[in-house]
Regions:
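A short, conserved structural fragment
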Residues: 9-17
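Conserved phosphate-binding catalytic cores of ATP/NTP-utilizing and phosphoryl-transfer enzymes
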Residues: 17-39, 146-166
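Flexible, glycine-rich phosphate/dinucleotide-binding loops
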Residues: 21, 48, 60, 110, ...
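Glycine-rich phosphate-binding loop and adjoining helix at the ATP-binding site
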Residues: 65, 69-166
Length: 166
């Protein structure tokens, strides 16, 4: 019953397993459905914001690199939310089911609570509740990580240092 529910929710797909010389009904395996589920990754850096829609296998669906002026009359939090909204409008034809938003940026960050205490280059950032504001705005979970920590973790999991002890 649970497999049927997962199939109906498009979480998994059935995959027929062919074994040479086997008899009877062929075995049916399950694979995770990754293409219909997306997450938005955001990287904020000096003067730029990168927004990338990816499926759950991390395959890139669409990406934008946009200017993010260091000084503006509009607070950075409002500008990020505006950029996310405009990204979704521009690429609504490619957007499937959005599961979450992942953000990397430099600065002093409370990753548990999604608060950016300070951020280099953007002087208006002081105790910015980026995670909470974006989660309330979009309705999906938001995860924030320091950019260097995220890059280090990605290198350890998927890069040349994969499987290394130190």
């Amino acid at each position: 019953k649970i497999v049927r529910e997962m199939l109906e929710a498009h979480l998994v797909q059935e995959l027929e397993i062919k074994e040479a010389g086997s008899r009877g009904r062929p075995a049916v395996g399950l694979v995770v459905e990754t293409e219909a589920w997306h997450y938005l990754s955001i990287r904020i850096s000096r003067g730029e914001i990168f927004l990338a829609l990816r499926d759950l296998s991390s395959k890139l669906v669409v990406e934008d690199c946009l200017d993010m002026p260091l000084v503006s009359e509009t607070p950075l939090l409002d500008r990020v939310i505006t950029q996310v909204d405009q990204f979704f409008i521009r690429h609504q034809q490619k957007l499937e089911r959005l599961t979450s938003i992942a953000i990397t940026l430099p600065g002093i960050i409370d990753t548990e609570n999604g608060i950016v205490h300070r951020m280099p280059f953007y002087e208006d950032v002081k105790e910015m509740p980026l995670g909470e504001a974006l989660e309330n705005h979009t309705g999906v979970p938001v995860y924030i990580q320091h950019d260097i920590s995220a890059w280090t973790m990605a290198e350890a999991l998927f890069g040349a240092s994969r499987g290394a002890r130190d």
